[in-house]
Amino acid sequence: LLDGGMGTMLQAAGLKLGARPEELNITDPALIESIHARYAAAGSRIINANTFGASAHKLAGSEYTLEEIIAAGIANCKRACAPYGALAALDVGPLGELLEPNGTLAFEDAVAEYGRIVRAGVAAGADLVFFETFTDLYELKAALLAAKENCDLPILASMSFEAGGRTFTGCTVESFAVTARGLGANAVGINCSLGPKEIFPMAKRLAEALP
């Protein structure tokens, strides 16, 4: 059982619009740890560290380095997990830049950036890596390749689909399932965008694509 959203909890706690949630790992660790602990106490066995937006692009202008933010995020998460025996996941989202040819980010640069993120998570003591809310299968491929090159931790991969059963960039459930597992993901899933009613048929297709 995984945890729930961090962003919504931080908004309820008064996070200002435009603020970087990941910086709270350093500026207000008690708040972050308390949110993790609430999820763990409710029965979550995998807790995602507050590192979803920890990429060079999204942290541009921050006074903290990517490595500092990830180290603090994993530390907060592990402290909250310890009393409950839960696992601390390095939570990784899209980089915030479109890959070529739709954007300007080269595939090799994306692999390098994800490698930096994964190495920081490993150094901080993450128990696993969770790539989530991806809409571009090409970017997820870069992330998974980087993870396999830089760690031997379990890897979870999840994409966000629209009501028609495809991601924003046109990826189908089946293409995602086969590609992600082929690149070493230990588990695959669907998150964000839709509710349980809409996701359930897609989840069935996901399972059927991986006999």
What is each residue range found by the language model?
Residues 1-211:
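Domain-level signal for soluble alpha/beta catalytic cores
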